[in-house]
Regions:
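Short hydrophobic alpha-helical segments that form membrane-spanning helices or hydrophobic packing faces
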Residues: 12, 95, 212, 397-401
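A structure-centric signal for secondary-structure junctions around beta-strands
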Residues: 12-13, 426
Length: 430
């Protein structure tokens, strides 16, 4: 701590640092500051108490905007902030408890075991090694199955803190370990991914892993109460079992069915699903057999943007002709067509929901529908699909090269007084 002295002076009551460590921090050799790496829930709640925004304050090291938003989202899940980010009465009550907001919420809403669990989660792990199972820590505090390698000093502090926290706690809320853990960490309810390895996705959207040898490795649902901080896929250091029924009962207001139509790049088709979700967790997933055609068409547009236009022969000829037209004519460049798909394509996509469907799709009617009658007449005059010889024979014009061309015998143009032109360019005769 530092005490104020005369203007420009600061008297330290603690350790005095030389400049070398600060040079080390600037060089990146020291651990990041707490505001860079720590949990920002308490900080975000304090901001809300004062009705302040982080941008209003000056920091030596400002908080990361994304991590601050995550903390505010957690506080909203805890009921400490409302939907506008303002502090609630429950949030104000949490600030009066000598605990992290997560744990304060658990003690306020949980049963008789909540103070003990809060004390365990506030202290360094009393068990050295072994399973991550939080139930083993509760047993050790209660004097049941205490392993030889227990940290007795930490255990003693946990017991003292638990007694202190229990004073004034009503304890009339849920008391199941998994539910208590989920009350504190609603963003860390973890659902096991498919596959043999114990890899999990958490309700907040991040990934987590568990040692394959841990007794909890086969559990479908866990609550991760301590993680190693890896930003890509954190390793669980403490966790509690959570039953499906307890999750549904305790968080019924946050679990709901969602309908979605999305383009699957991996499968090359539109997926229409009904999913029961808790945060990022998909608890149940079913086919949406009666998905509206409009929803499927909108999802297919993402597939079209990935695959490209894929025009057939007739559509490719039309596009080549249209792209020869000058200013004032509708834009038929591929970039423009893909950017404006919503304006011209959805109504033509009935029955199209996969890569194979799109390859077989006749694009020409959708393209020509973009033209007015006058535009169509102008196109036929300036860049016709066929050239009519003096003998009355119609010959298809090839627009695939840089210059339009036709293949015919020279005798067939006898009687023509001037060279045929296409959109201002000479028609090449081969």
């Amino acid at each position: 701590d530092a005490a104020r002295g005369p203007c420009g002076a600061c008297v330290g009551r603690g350790r005095v640092q030389t400049m070398d460590p600060w040079r080390g921090r600037r060089a990146g050799r020291l651990p990041p500051a707490e505001i860079e790496a720590g949990d920002l829930c308490a900080f975000a709640l304090e901001l809300a108490v004062w009705g302040a925004q982080a941008d209003d304050l000056k920091f030596v090291t400002p908080p990361h905007a994304g991590r601050l938003a995550e903390a505010q989202a957690v506080l909203h899940m805890l009921g400490a902030l409302d939907s506008t980010g303002r502090i609630t009465e429950h949030g104000r009550s949490l600030t009066k408890m000598p605990l992290h907001p997560r744990l304060a919420h658990m003690v306020a809403k949980g049963g008789r075991s909540a103070p003990t669990l809060a004390a365990i989660l506030s202290e360094r792990d009393p068990l050295r090694g072994g399973s991550v199972d939080l139930a083993l820590r509760l047993d050790a505090v209660a004097g049941k199955r205490v392993p030889a390698e227990v940290n007795h000093a930490a255990l003693s502090r946990i017991k003292q803190d638990a007694k202190r926290l229990a004073r004034g706690q009503t304890g009339d809320g849920p008391d199941t370990l998994g539910v208590l853990a989920a009350l504190a960490y609603p963003d860390r309810v973890a659902l096991r991914r498919k596959g043999d390895a114990p890899r999990y996705v958490m309700s907040g959207g991040k990934g987590a892993i568990l040692s394959e040898s841990d007794p909890l490795a086969g559990e479908r649902l866990l609550v991760a109460t301590d993680l190693d901080g890896d930003p890509r896929e954190a390793r669980m250091r403490q966790a509690a079992r959570l039953s499906d029924s307890d999750l549904r009962e305790s968080f019924a207001d946050q679990i709901g069915w969602h309908k979605l139509c999305v383009w699957s790049r991996r499968e090359g088709r539109v997926l229409a699903r009904q999913q029961e979700r808790f945060g990022a967790l998909v608890l149940d997933d079913r086919a949406w057999s009666d998905a509206p055609a409009e929803d499927i068409a909108q999802a297919m547009l993402d597939g079209v943007r990935q695959l490209g236009l894929m025009p057939g022969k007739a559509a490719a000829l039309f596009l080549a002709r249209a792209r020869l037209m000058g200013d004032g004519f509708p834009d038929f460049s591929e970039d423009h067509l893909l950017e404006t798909l919503e304006d011209w394509l959805p109504g033509h996509l009935a029955g199209v929901r996969s890569t194979a469907d799109w390859k077989a799709f006749d694009l020409l009617p959708a393209l020509t529908a973009r033209l007015s009658w006058d535009d169509q007449q102008a196109l036929d005059r300036a860049a016709p699909a066929h050239f009519t010889t003096p003998l009355g024979r119609k010959i298809a014009i090839d627009y695939s090269e840089t210059q339009p061309q036709i293949a015919l015998r020279l005798q067939e143009v006898f009687g023509t007084t001037r060279h045929p032109m296409i959109a201002g360019q000479p028609l090449q005769i081969t």
